[in-house]
């Protein structure tokens, strides 16, 4: 599975960036994942994302449990969807799906970090591995 995660808005604080890098490292045994932040959506490199299934993370999106997210990833794999673009911080971009981390508004860095943590948790579930050591 290949993921591109685009965070749109204010700068992501260093401590969140550090946490995201840690989750990228942990996720590397399950998938390929990149993280990029942009000041606004006009700067997004959409030209190379036509093949990607696009998901917006928004408080107004569909809420999933960790197990449901794991099941969604499994469905993607079974249906041949291998390239996924996650957009955090801009709810107006047209996408295939809209998911929610929480119905509460959070900072861009916190939302991004929680998304990475939940993706990692979903892969641990899919691989029948314990999450906590």
Give the location of each predicted region:
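N-terminal beta1-alpha1 ligand-phosphate binding loop
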Residues: 1-24
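Short, Lys/Arg-enriched, disordered terminal segments
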Residues: 1-5, 81, 132-133
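A residue-level signal for conserved active-site and pocket-lining positions in enzyme catalytic cores
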Residues: 5, 55, 115
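Acidic, metal-coordinating catalytic cores used for nucleic-acid/nucleotide bond scission
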Residues: 11-14, 60-66, 92
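Conserved strand-to-helix beginnings and helix N-cap segments that scaffold or border functional pockets
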Residues: 16-20, 66-70, 112-113
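S-adenosyl-L-methionine/SAH cofactor-binding core of RNA-modifying enzymes
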Residues: 28-85
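Glycine-rich beta-strand-to-loop/alpha-helix junction loops that act as flexible
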Residues: 86-90
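Structured adenosyl-cofactor binding patch, chiefly the S-adenosyl-L-methionine
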Residues: 91-92, 96-133
